[in-house]
Amino acid sequence: MNNSSELIAVINGFRNSGRFCDINIVINDERINAHRLILSGASEYFSILFSNNFIDSNEYEVNLSHLDYQSVNDLIDYIYGIPLSLTNDNVKYILSTADFLQIGSAITECEKYILKNLCSRNCIDFYIYADKYNNKKIESASFNTILRNILRLINDENFKYLTEESMIKILSDDMLNIKNEDFAPLILIKWLESTQQSCTVELLRCLRISLLSPQVIKSLYSHQLVSSIYECITFLNNIAFLDESFPRYHSIELISIGISNSHDKISINCYNHKKNTWEMISSRRYRCSFAVAVLDNIIYMMGGYDQSPYRSSKVIAYNTCTNSWIYDIPELKYPRSNCGGLADDEYIYCIGGIRDQDSSLTSSIDRWKPSKPYWQKYAKMREPKCDMGVAMLNGLIYVIGGIVKGDTCTDALESLSEDGWMKHQRLPIKMSNMSTIVHDGKIYISGGYNNSSVVNVISNLVLSYNPIYDEWTKLSSLNIPRINPALWSAHNKLYVGGGISDDVRTNTSETYDKEKDCWTLDNGHVLPRNYIMYKCEPIKHKYPLEKTQYTNDFLKYLESFIGS
């Protein structure tokens, strides 16, 4: 004999013939012959049992009638070199028995089998099992499978076996795979109906109430399993006082607009949360130095340069709902580049920039309402400028920094309302080409150029502006200085990505930790190589149901959108 497999085969032959066997495993009326030494080498349970005088050395039987005979027999066969034959039907019993007998290699093999075969058909069953036996590895994996397949599972026969504690955990999770928060109450109601359990305030608190449509809130009010509970109605009567909720990960899509390394085309990329990668969903011919604004899930790109040396007045758009380009949009009043783009609930705004005729700066702000045949003059800034930060907050247009006459940066901060322009606290330093975002009631800016005279110092500064106190706060700096990066807010976090650093396109991204006031490089949002990200926008999924009138069977109507 020259290998262990031959030795194991010989020892198993001894067992089958009863040779040298010194212990019998008794399970009800069944007996399994074995050797103490072999069992002790494979099982911590048997090792302790046989070595610490738990049974007399002359005792030839161990009673394990509380265990499943077939599982014990399969595991002892496994100890003697016979592979486990695992199925979805027996793996739970074998794993539970292996865990009791503390057979580590069998436990690992069963766990691998379950993790490999987890799917929507068995995830609830395995989740309930793992929760009962405190197997954190399987519990976590099966729970994540439930989150991914939740809308498929609400009609599963096992859905009713989930406990209220489990439902609270599911409905509270940011990764719940719903594209609109209105589906969360549907999940809750389907579970209540399947269990015939009355609703609780704890379950209602799991919903992102501020994101629900009026139709779904009415559906909650009118459902018997909710309306019959006084505490639930009291809670729903006070939802106006609840804090603003943040969308779940899958209820928005991160869409980036930039220039790809493939023939320098405009590239529209979508972030794949499952793969943690950016995937290009569309592209078109080259353009740069354009402004971007988003209205009704349509991304508008205004002005800039195309493949000619001249600035453009063309406006194109990408519809994220239909995944199609729109070209029949009225042109700007004149060609311009390096301008700012904004949108409110009705209009697209094109702000400042450089005019084509003589490369002069412009102060004009034009706006366009979709369906209108032309752009109209709206206002003028106090001074011509380009490459400034722009933001829409509380109905006001804010213009931040920028490049003014003489190719110098400015530190001005001004806002435009119906009453005209208002000056605010100046920036701590003169800046341009920074990224801007509104988050949690404040304006954040990052990167760009800074300094007072020559525009040539790439910045890693991050600042926030509080409009209530009219003050700027300096936050922790970026790890990588960058100009024209994209700054975005998603899931109550700030991210910055892309841009140009040291004259080279950077594909790095960073995430801001508010509690620690620090930026960390974010490997999950790394951009494609040589990709300049102009802007990143969280796009909220929209459904036709949002314009539907309420009816008594509205939740059934909502259910018809599952899978669309």
UniProtKB/Swiss-Prot annotation:
Protein keywords: Host cytoplasm, Host-virus interaction, Kelch repeat, Modulation of host E3 ubiquitin ligases by virus, Modulation of host ubiquitin pathway by virus, Repeat, Ubl conjugation pathway
Domain BACK residues, every copy: 123-219
Subunit structure comment from the entry: Interacts (via BTB domain) with host CUL3.
Kelch repeat locations: 252-297, 298-346, 347-395, 397-441, 442-492, 494-539
GO CC annotations, alphabetized: host cell cytoplasm
Subcellular location: Host cytoplasm
InterPro entries associated with the record: BACK, BTB/POZ_dom, Kelch-typ_b-propeller, Kelch_1, SKP1/BTB/POZ_sf, Vaccinia_A55R
Listed name of the protein: Kelch repeat and BTB domain-containing protein 1
Gene3D superfamilies: 1.25.40.420, Kelch-type beta propeller, Potassium Channel Kv1.1, Chain A
Pfam families the record matches: BACK, BTB, Kelch_1
Function: Probable substrate-specific adapter of CUL3-containing E3 ubiquitin-protein ligases which mediate the ubiquitination and subsequent proteasomal degradation of host target proteins.
Domain BTB: 21-88
PANTHER family: KELCH-LIKE PROTEIN 32, LD33804P
Top-level lineage group: Viruses
Domain comment (free text): The BTB domain is responsible for the interaction with CUL3 while the Kelch repeat domains supposely serve to recruit the cellular substrates.
One GO BP annotation of this record: symbiont-mediated perturbation of host ubiquitin-like protein modification
